[in-house]
Amino acid sequence: MADGPRCKRRKQANPRRNNVTNYNNVIEANSDSDDEDKLHIVEEESITDAADCDASVPEDDLPTDHTVLPENSEREGSTNSCWEDEGKETKEILGPEAQSDEVGCTVKEDECDSDAENEQNHDPNVEEFLQQEDTAVIYPEAPEEDQRQGTPEASGQDENGTPDAFSQLLTCPYCDRGYKRFTSLKEHIKYRHEKNEDNFSCSLCSYTFAYRTQLDRHMTSHKSGRDQRHVTQSSGNRKFKCTECGKAFKYKHHLKEHLRIHSGEKPYECPNCKKRFSHSGSYSSHISSKKCIGLMPVKGRARSGLKTSQCSSPSLSASPGSPARPQIRQKIENKPLQEQLPVNQIKTEPVDYEFKPIVVASGINCSTPLQNGVFSGGSPLQATSSPQGVVQAVVLPTVGLVSPISINLSDIQNVLKVAVDGNVIRQVLENNHANLASKEQETISNASIQQAGHSLISAISLPLVDQDGTTKIIINYSLEQPSQLQVVPQNLKKEHSVPTNSCKNEKLPEDLTVKSEKDKNFEGETNDSTCLLCDDCPGDLNALQELKHYETKNPPQLPQSSGTEAEKPSSPAPSETGENNLSPGQPPLKNLLSLLKAYYALNAQPSAEELSKIADSVNLPLDVVKKWFEKMQAGQISVQSSGPSSPEQVKISSPTDNDDQAATTNESEPQNSTNNSQNPANTSKSQTSSGGSTQNGSRSSTPSPSPLNLSSSRNSQGYTYTAEGVQEEPQMEPLDLSLPKQHGELLERSTITSVYQNSVYSVQEEPLNLTCAKKEPQKDNSITDSDPIVNVIPPSANPINIAIPTVTAQLPTIVAIADQNSVPCLRALAANKQTILIPQVAYTYSTTVSPAVQETPPKQTQANGSQDERQDTSSEGVSNVEDQNDSDSTPPKKKMRKTENGMYACDLCDKIFQKSSSLLRHKYEHTGKRPHECGICKKAFKHKHHLIEHMRLHSGEKPYQCDKCGKRFSHSGSYSQHMNHRYSYCKREAEERDSTEQEEVGQEVLSSEHAGARASPSQIDSDERESLTREEEEDSEKEEEEEEEKDVEGLQEEKECRKLQDVEEEEEVEEEEEEEEGKTEGNKNDDVVNRASNAEPEVIQSNGQVSEEKTNKA
């Protein structure tokens, strides 16, 4: 390497520059690199150094057997090459783009024809060079004088140009790199420009590389400086790139959180200080830190209220003067579980932010607190009549939900009455002033509640998680007066005194109010209960029912005047119209039915286009109209008003008829025993109420009189009612919705019939029970299969389960679940439960219990909140069925509702998942459910891998080991913390420990008194630092405790060793002094004994031995 300044050349007196005749034949040379490493980056770095080496080669050393241009051009090229080298350096700094231009092109102006000409001349010359076996030297063209002024060395250059080795360089025809040796040029072409299958080629500059890593490194030279900042050695693994800033991430969820920085979205909010976070990690750190201390549990975690019955719950007292005013729910995805909010905060809909009216109970005694997760008190809650419309609300603490949910007990009662009663749909909007415009759902009851009977709420459970992930609250609800609860079930045949209940006008979501039109005149009339949304229903399936289903999808389309759930599309409506049960709000229903029948009369078999037009004209969904036409064509719906207009028209069939018809129905389609029992149509004998309400005998003929079929799923295999089978139940009396009662042999031989209480709520003879009926499909079609089930139910076994889904934004009106494939509704707690879903309220009617369930009715009743702790932890109060089999015998796709894109959306927050299992695990965040429990210490975890790591604490397994210090870890988190934060200095600590141990061993041989003192400080410090890092790990608490105990034991042992060593040392020194002083042996022994009294017994023994030795010496 030349140490002196570059371009210091031998000067000649008479430089001649005008003899270069053909510049086109001259090939510019850049530089040479003797040590080519096959990498473009390294080649660039070596250009300058190689040029300096070549500059020192004297002219005399040049070979003589090669073709040489005239001497003048040789001298001219010497200085020119210097400037070319300088220009090359600047181009290297600028980047590869600048290198693409030939250096000579920057020098020549007028004397050089063009870049194209030079390139054209390169190829034949290079071919000629490649054919030669020796080195050819070519001298570049002479530069213009004024071009030199740009470089620093130019000022010091003499006019005399000097020939140098730069003129000897060979240029690559592909990339214009110069090489002094021909073999170097050949190698360069072979490794850089010769393409084959094994090489990796750059698409930008045609460079080839033997390894992909070389190509990746080379590609970074083409990136801009902004992009290169984010390029790392592991850039190949970062597949997810931000389109805004170009930053790349290894994982997609990291990119999602990063994008929130650009969008400004901050979905995580602290419930205490209201601070918002864009990253879940920041939110988690904030929650777990001690900075924001409020109502939140420690580290943001809380156990499920069902698991720990002693969880704190707010008192359910509400001020009678003011209604519960809901607050808008902020969108939080990972709030801490069981957040205790003020009583006036009510959970609103999370997804679409539509605000449903809050149910408000008038005059309800809400003073009793929740006990063991169940709202119960010494006396049941009573919804008494309150003409003043006093508004009180029961606020239930939700488990893992955003905020407590408010329940209006009186509205629940009214809606329940209306729902059970077929006349639900005849409701009129009267609370126009109570609107949703203010986003505060404040339902004001203007009309006084006329209630002769009392509604009793014996228990309100904490939220439960259904099999499909829906969170519900179960209310043990009884509509009878307390005196009537004593009635014996066998008194079924006696007419029930029907209390006159005019439901108060309640504002349902979408401004749909349900007003029970049950005037005292209509108390005795048949309930127009029909199968809601049930395709399997007989022809008298109420159009109302399907209309309800439609309303859930398109609530705004329903005219308010038609009633929230006017019975629209099906034939059942005519029966109701004939029975004068229709309220003024029902004429639209008549119009709809008359329109449908008119269309049917015109064309009994309309085409698809005509059906769509008909559906648009009647404002009903196409599938509903299509089904109605199909049933009309099948004869299941009579063209005339299918229901008898008067009680006299009711057809009465004998019990044998019922049996035969039930048998045919069973043969036609297998049924769940639960469905059979719950099918209102199967009601054996119900008495006509005092009002003389009639029951429709043939369900097919009279759609409205048939009781509501509340079967929750098509899987439960409810009846597909044919015209013949539908008529199984000629019922002379209104449906008795109380518990199914044994009617002698009739019930024993017939399919289990669920006797629902009269729609007017006649006195129930038994208290309602919250036992959950377990799904048990009926394997035999014979009626006798249901016989054992009939007798299974204890007097109080027939509960009305009121399941209140905490979030049912998609359910604007009362909805009965019929088919889980088509109906986007919540399911009952057990798949066979018959359920009505009302905005924020789902009523589950369980009329019979399968034999498997009868053994554990108390537990199921307690499942509402006070159930046995073990069962709650496993099933979270959903049902025993889910505990036995997560798949729940239904296809997985039916368990979770899919969105349009096939994704699984959480109904408690806005998150969407690709797999149902991911959604199920996500639900644990809301519910606090921890399904994976340690069998040793009973600690539960949300994720299985957390349990696996926890089990290592018990087994002592430590699979993770630091390769530096050799320390082992049982948790991957502890190992990760160590590797991220302590790996840089953990080896030094290990060496220090080793050195101290060696010192300790050596000093034990010589003097062991100082070794322990030196070893302990480093050990203590390392252990303290280690414990600090491990505190961040949630599942390593036990490990920390064990290590701390070991540390304490070690310190105690060290202290004891020090004491022993100090005692021994003092004894030796004093004994020597005593020997010198000639003290007596007795004095020595006394001193030794006195000092040994403060030490261990071993020390005393050793002291005694020492004293004996000294005595011998003396």
From Swiss-Prot:
Compositional bias of kind Acidic residues: 1031-1047, 1063-1078
SUPFAM superfamilies the UniProt entry points to: beta-beta-alpha zinc fingers, Homeodomain-like
Pfam families from the UniProt entry: zf-C2H2, zf-Di19
Locations listed in the record: Nucleus
SMART domains named in the record: HOX, ZnF_C2H2
GO MF annotation terms: DNA-binding transcription factor activity, RNA polymerase II-specific; E-box binding; RNA polymerase II cis-regulatory region sequence-specific DNA binding; zinc ion binding
Name used for this protein in its record: Zinc finger E-box-binding homeobox 1
